[in-house]
């Protein structure tokens, strides 16, 4: 514990304060306030964090001793005040609980009831956050035997007041000779850590990690020390060095990592004004500034700070794995004779774990640094790597240099890993965890721990990349065929599966450099393929996949797939069926690996539609594009066949169709045309809007719920409709707006429910939606376009300036308005309100929500049903949209663009 520090607590001054005041509470509160202010100022000035948290514990010791002395405990009383838990270690953060054990010799507490109650009341009154228990030595033993948490807490204890002999007796009766022997304790703690990690999704890379409990957090270091304490009686990192479980460099790294996390935790408590161990978005930017990080042209300060955080916890996880593996080998010796199985002259299995046959294996044959992972892929029965071999891997990483990277033995081994029938993802993760992957591929090393500060990318770039490869592997499993039927079928027939894994490894490799990461990554991928002696065609395919890995997703979500020109342009880009197959599978894996919430039935159906329409175009030949007139004729003929079979008069149908333009038949299937036509012809002419709802199979690919609205056109139709859908908690994915020559509108919306699924066949929900929409369209003044709802906490921290781009599609005679803005409740309704103010008509819309941002595309015309041709009008429209979408944003707006 620290030496006496009068600036923090002056006992003489405190006694004088007590003497001057009628109540002791004010003096105690003043002393607490004083040491808190001094310690916070010292933290802000960069003082050593270990000293700060030890000083805080010392200050609380002084307060507790002064409080304890105010009560009559009797002469030679067998009662002691004992610090336990983190406070017992002598470590205390600004708002951490002060965990206390009032320890008695016997279970008879009655004689001490009055002073105990008075003491605890005083602590409450002076504002100390105390967690307390009152137990006898025997009660401690009974509760510790039954509860892992209790025994763990009692292992870390020190006496604050009273005889230390009570604590010594308590430690004796709760020692490993009486309960929780080291083997049992180790197994329980290992299981506890596994459960805790599962709570945080078994990743160090959560967007808002818990610095204490997440994988790689402070608790992982404490778990190691608790295990060591139970086995060896030692409770510090240097003791692990003496016992041979750590080397000095690892001990130093763990100590510095612990101190970094202590600084983060101290800052969190200080900023939050309470006990807060979650590194929430609310605090990440502030802590980044506090730690001296600044934005630059390539990365935000918060991204650089979080990369430091993720690299620290990754290193802690690596050493936690190493030490626990080592503990397992020592604490859980195999009761059976050791089983040795040679693999080759360099490696063998010892009881199922791979190890080197000699300590100099990596030094003598550096290629073994890669070979070990290939062997584990070839032998999936291998349980893992022995602790000594993990340490040798770590210590031999320096052998990987440029000469190593260009050695054909090493390049061949690395490619062989990608050709393995199983274990690719698992062993790439091991390579990353042991620091081999980033050393072998320096470009991969740059993205380790790199977070993109948004809600769309929920993993660091390296974790996302390895997750993508994991998803590619999952597509090979038979059980995945139901969820990913097309991708599972395609991946089985890829001529060289290793190429898609290489493309996956490199698709985001250039993130964080500035510039177009797809272009830069394609260059890196080409260089990798060349240095690994891949054939020219393979090299070009991998590079092309990296360069275009976003194109299929962007096309599917932002363009009108009913437009034959869109399909033709995309088919020209891919060129052949092989490129299409590889790109489709890569896109499916990329979306799933970016954020699990992104993959829904709608996105799946859009990609499937784009794939199949492109496949048809390629089979037909790029020199034979789809003829629009022929497509319209085919749709009408098929629809008419259905209608006639249903008893609808052909003349009535054709009369209705004559009022519709070509776009209607290009943008709807024959089945939908027949469905709409029959319902319209049977709908009473009483002015009530017609609202139809069904599960959609648009072009046999889309999956969602289709809402079809037929009603007399009105000025505010789109604005009112989207506002009503917002209030009904519907997420609009697509909108197709058709206005007939008789001034009726035929609008089709593809929607998902709030949970991301289609509405389904729930009669009550369908009735609610139908009635809500009819009411809104009959009473439009009751539906304001500004939806007032609370903005979710996480969205508040990702505000950015809305961007509005307007261009002209001369072929379709519409203006294309693209909006990129922070997601907010009622955003689409706000946009609809602006369109209403400017007397604009929406012909089509593509809606995409990506994490905290929306990327929506609207095809609009003016009051004369023409594209927007007036630059001044466009500027005013942009300004109005930016102003409306910037509300509650808190950021300056960025310039927008007009491209005619």
From Swiss-Prot:
Keyword match Hydrolase: yes
Region: Uridylyltransferase, residue numbers: 1-342
Ranges where the record places region Uridylyl-removing: 343-705
Gene3D superfamilies in UniProt: Beta Polymerase, domain 2, cca-adding enzyme, domain 2, Nucleotidyltransferases domain 2
Reaction catalysis annotation: [protein-PII]-L-tyrosine + UTP = [protein-PII]-uridylyl-L-tyrosine + diphosphate; [protein-PII]-uridylyl-L-tyrosine + H2O = [protein-PII]-L-tyrosine + UMP + H(+)
SUPFAM superfamilies for this protein: ACT-like, HD-domain/PDEase-like, Nucleotidyltransferase, Nucleotidyltransferase substrate binding subunit/domain
GO terms of molecular function: [protein-PII] uridylyltransferase activity; phosphoric diester hydrolase activity
Domain of life of the native organism: Bacteria
Keywords from the named record: Hydrolase, Magnesium, Multifunctional enzyme, Nucleotidyltransferase, Repeat, Transferase
Domain HD: 461-583
Regulation: Uridylyltransferase (UTase) activity is inhibited by glutamine, while glutamine activates uridylyl-removing (UR) activity.
Cofactor dependence: Mg(2+)
Biological process, per Gene Ontology: regulation of nitrogen utilization
Annotated EC: 2.7.7.59, 3.1.4.-
CDD domains from the UniProt entry: ACT_ACR-UUR-like_2 (cd04899), ACT_UUR-like_1 (cd04900), HDc (cd00077), NT_GlnE_GlnD_like (cd05401)
Domain ACT: 706-789, 816-891
Domain remarks: Has four distinct domains: an N-terminal nucleotidyltransferase (NT) domain responsible for UTase activity, a central HD domain that encodes UR activity, and two C-terminal ACT domains that seem to have a role in glutamine sensing.
Function: Modifies, by uridylylation and deuridylylation, the PII regulatory proteins (GlnB and homologs), in response to the nitrogen status of the cell that GlnD senses through the glutamine level. Under low glutamine levels, catalyzes the conversion of the PII proteins and UTP to PII-UMP and PPi, while under higher glutamine levels, GlnD hydrolyzes PII-UMP to PII and UMP (deuridylylation). Thus, controls uridylylation state and activity of the PII proteins, and plays an important role in the regulation of nitrogen assimilation and metabolism.
UniProt similarity note: Belongs to the GlnD family.
Protein known as: Bifunctional uridylyltransferase/uridylyl-removing enzyme
């Amino acid at each position: 514990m620290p030496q006496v520090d009068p600036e923090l607590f002056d006992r003489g001054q405190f006694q004088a304060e007590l003497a001057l005041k009628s109540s002791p509470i004010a003096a105690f509160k003043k002393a607490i306030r004083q040491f808190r202010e001094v310690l916070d100022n010292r933290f802000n000035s960069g003082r050593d964090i270990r000293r700060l948290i030890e000083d805080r514990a010392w200050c609380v010791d002084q307060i507790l001793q002064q409080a304890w002395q105010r009560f009559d405990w009797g002469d030679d009383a067998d009662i002691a005040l004992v610090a336990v838990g983190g406070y017992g270690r002598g470590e205390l953060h600004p708002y951490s609980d002060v965990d206390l054990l009032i320890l008695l010799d016997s279970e008879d507490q009655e004689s001490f009831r009055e002073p105990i109650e008075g003491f605890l009341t005083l602590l409450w009154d002076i504002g100390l956050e105390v967690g307390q228990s009152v137990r006898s030595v025997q009660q401690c033993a009974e509760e510790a035997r039954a509860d892992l948490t209790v025994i763990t807490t009692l292992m870390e204890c020190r006496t604050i007041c009273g005889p230390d002999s009570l604590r010594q007796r308590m430690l004796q009766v709760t020692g490993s000779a009486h309960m929780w022997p080291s083997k049992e304790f180790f197994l329980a703690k290992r299981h506890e850590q596994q459960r805790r990690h599962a709570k945080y999704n078994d990743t160090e890379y959560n967007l808002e990690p818990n610095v204490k409990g997440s994988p790689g957090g402070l608790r992982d270091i404490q778990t190691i020390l608790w295990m060591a304490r139970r086995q060896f009686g030692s409770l510090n990192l240097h003791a692990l060095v003496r016992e041979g479980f750590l080397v000095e460099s690892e001990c130093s790294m763990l100590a510095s990592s612990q101190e970094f996390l202590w600084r983060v935790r101290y800052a969190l408590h200080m900023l939050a004004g309470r006990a807060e161990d979650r590194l929430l978005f609310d605090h990440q930017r502030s802590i980044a500034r506090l730690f001296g990080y600044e934005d630059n042209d390539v990365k935000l300060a918060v991204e650089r700070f979080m990369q430091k955080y993720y690299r620290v916890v990754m290193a802690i996880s690596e050493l936690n794995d190493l030490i626990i593996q080592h503990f397992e080998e020592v604490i859980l010796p195999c009761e059976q004779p050791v089983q040795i199985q040679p693999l080759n002259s360099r490696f063998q299995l010892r009881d199922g774990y791979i190890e080197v046959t000699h300590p100099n294996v990596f030094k003598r044959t550096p290629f073994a640094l890669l070979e070990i992972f290939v062997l584990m892929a070839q032998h999936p029965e291998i349980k893992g790597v022995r602790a000594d071999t993990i340490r040798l891997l770590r210590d031999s990483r320096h052998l990987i240099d440029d000469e190593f990277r260009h050695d054909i033995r090493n390049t061949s081994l690395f490619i062989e890993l990608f050709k393995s029938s199983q274990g690719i993802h698992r062993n790439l993760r091991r390579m990353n965890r042991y620091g081999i992957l980033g050393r072998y591929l320096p470009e991969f090393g740059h993205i380790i721990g790199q977070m993109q500060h948004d809600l769309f990318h929920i993993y660091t770039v390296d974790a996302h990349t390895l997750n993508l490869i994991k998803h590619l592997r999952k597509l090979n499993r038979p059980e995945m065929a139901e969820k990913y039927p097309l991708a599972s079928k395609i991946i089985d027939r890829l001529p060289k599966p290793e190429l898609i894994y290489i493309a996956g490894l490199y698709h985001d490799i250039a993130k964080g450099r500035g510039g177009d990461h797809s272009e830069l990554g394609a260059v890196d991928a080409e260089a990798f393929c060349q240095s690994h002696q891949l054939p020219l065609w393979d090299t070009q395919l991998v590079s092309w996949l990296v360069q275009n890995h976003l194109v299929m997703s962007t096309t599917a979500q932002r363009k009108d797939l009913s437009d034959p020109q869109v399909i033709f342009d995309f088919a020209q880009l891919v060129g052949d069926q092989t490129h299409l197959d590889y790109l489709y599978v890569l896109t499916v894996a990329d979306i799933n690996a970016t954020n699990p919430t992104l993959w829904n039935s709608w996105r799946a159906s859009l990609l499937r539609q784009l794939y199949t329409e492109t496949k048809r175009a390629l089979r037909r030949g790029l020199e034979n594009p789809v003829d629009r007139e022929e497509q319209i004729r085919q749709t009408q003929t098929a629809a008419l066949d259905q209608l006639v079979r249903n008893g609808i008069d052909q003349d009535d149908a054709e009369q209705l169709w004559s009022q519709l333009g070509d776009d209607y038949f290009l943008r709807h299937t024959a089945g939908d045309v027949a469905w709409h036509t029959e319902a319209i012809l049977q709908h009473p002419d009483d002015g009530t809007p017609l609202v139809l709802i069904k599960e959609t199979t648009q072009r046999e690919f889309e999956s969602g719920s289709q809402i079809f609205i037929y009603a007399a056109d009105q000025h505010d139709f789109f604005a009112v409709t989207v506002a009503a859908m917002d209030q009904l908690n519907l997420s609009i994915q697509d909108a197709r707006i058709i206005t007939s020559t008789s001034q009726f509108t035929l609008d089709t919306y593809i929607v998902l429910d709030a949970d991301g699924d289609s509405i389904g066949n729930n009669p009550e929900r369908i009735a609610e939606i139908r009635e809500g929409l009819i009411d809104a369209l009959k009473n439009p003044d009751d539906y304001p376009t500004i939806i007032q709802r609370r903005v979710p906490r996480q969205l508040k921290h990702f505000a950015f300036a809305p961007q509005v781009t307007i261009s002209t599609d001369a072929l379709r005679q519409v203006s294309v308005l693209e909006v990129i803005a922070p997601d907010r409740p009622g955003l689409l309704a706000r946009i609809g309100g602006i369109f209403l103010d400017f007397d604009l008509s929406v012909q089509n819309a593509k809606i995409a929500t990506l994490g905290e941002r929306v990327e929506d595309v609207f095809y609009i015309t003016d009051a004369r049903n023409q594209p927007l041709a007036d630059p001044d009008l466009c500027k005013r429209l942009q300004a109005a949209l930016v102003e409306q979408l910037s509300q509650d944003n808190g950021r300056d707006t960025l310039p927008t663009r007009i491209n005619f």
